[in-house]
Amino acid sequence: MVPTMAPARAESAASVDTLQRSLVAAYEVQDFTAALDALRQLRQLEPEELRWIEADATISTDRKDFTRALKAYDAAYELARGDAGAEARILNGRALAREGIYDWPNALTDYDEVLRLAETNGFAPDPYVLNSRGNVRGSLGRWNDAKDDYESAGDLFQNAKGFRNGASTTQRLDGAIYAYSNKALATAQLGDEAGALKQVEALTRRAPNSADVRAAAAALYYSAGRFGNAEDAWERACSREAGCAKYKDLDYVRRIRRWPPAMVDKLSAFLELKR
């Protein structure tokens, strides 16, 4: 005899599959309202399913509803206890949500725990996490520590398998350039402008199409009184595909790109000249 609950279970499984497809489709087009509606129904069907709680947290972070995101991450973390990989993944997401509300101390605590979990379980640290922790340490004014994190992240990216793929640029190479650029910015914040400029000049040779590196070079050249070099670096930044428009917006540079205060001031001084 077929159990009487079998049709109900089959119907539930079909509903979950349909809702999951709706969730993925909505998220792909950034329709967060539809995505969260699908998640609400999924969580009603499977209230203890970790992936739906994590998805809620991720989508809430993307739509900048950090209060909801943190609540979901807290619930997900409790469910994931004992699974080091899941714990690390959730804590990394929660740290990002904490950054969204400028809760630097607790974001740092979460990133520290992610890296501790990797170490105690025999895994190499994630360079993306190290770079993120560097950002948080910088926001807390701990620029020496931030610089160390950026350097470690850059080295890990650079030494990773698949760093280069023929003549093409890989995601790992982009990560290395970004981390080393952050290291150079932190070096400037610590007062070593000559050292920072030397690092940036090396990066412009390795990543000639990086508008971020070119903009940093312009700011540092201008601060050093090398005005012709500053103008040339800026023109090269503006001629890149990404362009220099974002770097004319100091709020973007400070709050989104997370340049340190000293570098924001140097860029501001250079931009004043161009007005």
Q: How should these model regions be labeled?
A:
Residues A13-A14, P47, G85-E87, A124-D126, ...:
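Residue signature of alpha-solenoid helical repeat architecture, marking inter-repeat boundaries
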Residues V24, T58, L96, N135, ...:
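Residue-level recognition of tetratricopeptide repeat
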Residues G243-R275:
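Terminal, low-structured helical/coil segments at or just beyond the last alpha-helical repeat
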